[in-house]
């Protein structure tokens, strides 16, 4: 009799995806982040579902409903902080996952990579809308500033912004629709994740060397299930440390004040995971130029496979490309720092230089480094 695991139409799919899946024997801990992202998504959907049972998406009661969740609901404070800090863990894993893809040349699986970029956009949109829901000062003004950027689009901009707002300012209609979309998008993301995995399993995983490993594969279970569980424990430890000891470390104190359209906070800034893009947006004095730079800072990931000039896939044996990669990492950390600073000297010029360097590294320095390495191979 055939094992049900291999014969049942539904269980067979799970088996071929997570149990008998052939995986390269050499993949390192940098390959753990895919499974961690899946767990983050599941955690966010679960905690979000329970929060939605107590939250009200009305401007007059939203702020108080969040306070009610924290004070009166059984373990409501824990649900709220797991959800808020879970988003931070989600983005840490996301950025490390994308960084891994860049370093080891995983972007050469073009369908998987492009699907990943779409997922990144979807997660960013979800996180932005979720930040608006507590209806604190930074929620309101963050929503106002970011949605207002669309008014820079020629001809249709103003109409588009008013259409998104559902009126002439961020108000009741905006909050209600943001809650609806914030609830809906994670389920769409779950479907996109399945497509992402479908594309990945067409080719199989990449490995640190970047060399095809078809002749050296091992089953995913038990080897990588055990390895992923270790990563999971480490992530849960980090998340619980945040939630139980420093729940407000990554939040903004302004969000503990109810939204007030008549009082603008001195420094409007998004959550830490958007600061790099916010710094790029602010570094350009022109509104439309800033919006384009903001969009391109993420969209540029799509053209990375086209900018690959090296004869080798991975950066593991390419010292010049490694230098450019770590320069990019340092530049992104600089942008993240600048995004959280006020718009004054010397932060303005640092932000502008870091923004120029960001695009320069990806479009010019990385492809040139690879061409030089090709010449060094001959030498």
Curated annotation (Swiss-Prot):
The chain crosses the membrane at residues 33-53, 77-98, 113-133, 178-198, 226-246, 288-308, 320-340, 347-367. One of its GO terms (biological process) is mitochondrial electron transport, ubiquinol to cytochrome c. Component of the ubiquinol-cytochrome c reductase complex (complex III or cytochrome b-c1 complex) that is part of the mitochondrial respiratory chain. The b-c1 complex mediates electron transfer from ubiquinol to cytochrome c. Contributes to the generation of a proton gradient across the mitochondrial membrane that is then used for ATP synthesis. Heme b b566 binds at residues 97, 196. InterPro entries: Cyt_b/b6_C (IPR005798), Cyt_b/b6_C_sf (IPR036150), Cyt_b/b6_N (IPR005797), Cytb/b6-like_sf (IPR027387), Cytochrome_b (IPR030689), Cytochrome_b_C_euk/bac (IPR048260), Cytochrome_b_N_euk/bac (IPR048259), Di-haem_cyt_TM (IPR016174). Binds 2 heme b groups non-covalently. It is a multi-pass membrane protein. PROSITE patterns: CYTB_CTER, CYTB_NTER. Belongs to the cytochrome b family. Heme b b562 binds at residues 83, 182. It is found in: Mitochondrion inner membrane. It comes from Laephotis wintoni. This is Cytochrome b. The cytochrome bc1 complex contains 11 subunits: 3 respiratory subunits (MT-CYB, CYC1 and UQCRFS1), 2 core proteins (UQCRC1 and UQCRC2) and 6 low-molecular weight proteins (UQCRH/QCR6, UQCRB/QCR7, UQCRQ/QCR8, UQCR10/QCR9, UQCR11/QCR10 and a cleavage product of UQCRFS1). This cytochrome bc1 complex then forms a dimer. Signal peptide: none annotated.
């Amino acid at each position: 009799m055939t094992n049900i695991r291999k014969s049942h139409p539904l269980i067979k799919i799970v088996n071929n995806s997570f149990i008998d899946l052939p995986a390269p024997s050499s993949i390192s801990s940098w390959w753990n982040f895919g499974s961690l992202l899946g767990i983050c998504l599941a955690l966010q959907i679960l905690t979000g579902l329970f929060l939605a049972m107590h939250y009200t998406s009305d401007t007059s009661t939203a702020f108080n409903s969040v306070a009610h969740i924290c004070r009166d609901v059984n373990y409501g404070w824990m649900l709220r902080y797991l959800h808020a800090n879970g988003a931070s863990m989600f983005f840490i894993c996301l950025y490390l996952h994308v960084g891994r893809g860049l370093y080891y040349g995983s972007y050469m699986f073009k369908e998987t990579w492009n699907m990943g970029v779409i997922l990144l956009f979807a997660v960013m949109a979800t996180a932005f809308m979720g930040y608006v829901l507590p209806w604190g000062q930074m929620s309101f003004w963050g929503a106002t500033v970011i949605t207002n950027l669309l008014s820079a689009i020629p001809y249709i901009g103003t109409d588009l912004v008013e259409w998104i707002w559902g009126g002439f300012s961020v108000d009741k209609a905006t909050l209600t629709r943001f809650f609806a979309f914030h609830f809906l998008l994670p389920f769409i993301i779950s479907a996109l994740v399945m497509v992402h995995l479908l594309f990945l399993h067409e080719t199989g995983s990449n490995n640190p060397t970047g060399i095809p490993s078809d002749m050296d594969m091992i089953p995913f279970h038990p080897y990588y299930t055990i390895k992923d569980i270790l990563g999971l424990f480490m992530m849960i430890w980090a998340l619980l440390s945040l939630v139980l000891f420093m729940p407000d470390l990554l939040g903004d104190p302004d969000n503990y004040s109810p939204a007030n359209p008549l009082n603008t906070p001195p420094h409007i800034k998004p959550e830490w995971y958007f600061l790099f893009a916010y710094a790029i947006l602010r570094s350009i004095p022109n509104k439309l130029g800033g919006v384009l730079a903001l969009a391109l800072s993420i969209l540029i990931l799509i053209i990375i496979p086209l900018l690959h000039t090296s004869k080798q896939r991975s950066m593991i044996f390419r010292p010049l490309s490694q230098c450019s990669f770590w320069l990019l990492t340092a530049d992104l950390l600089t942008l993240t720092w600048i995004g959280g600073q006020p718009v004054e000297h010397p932060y303005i010029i640092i932000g502008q230089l870091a923004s120029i360097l960001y695009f320069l590294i990806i479009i010019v320095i990385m492809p040139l480094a690879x061409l030089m390495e090709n010449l060094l191979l001959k030498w």
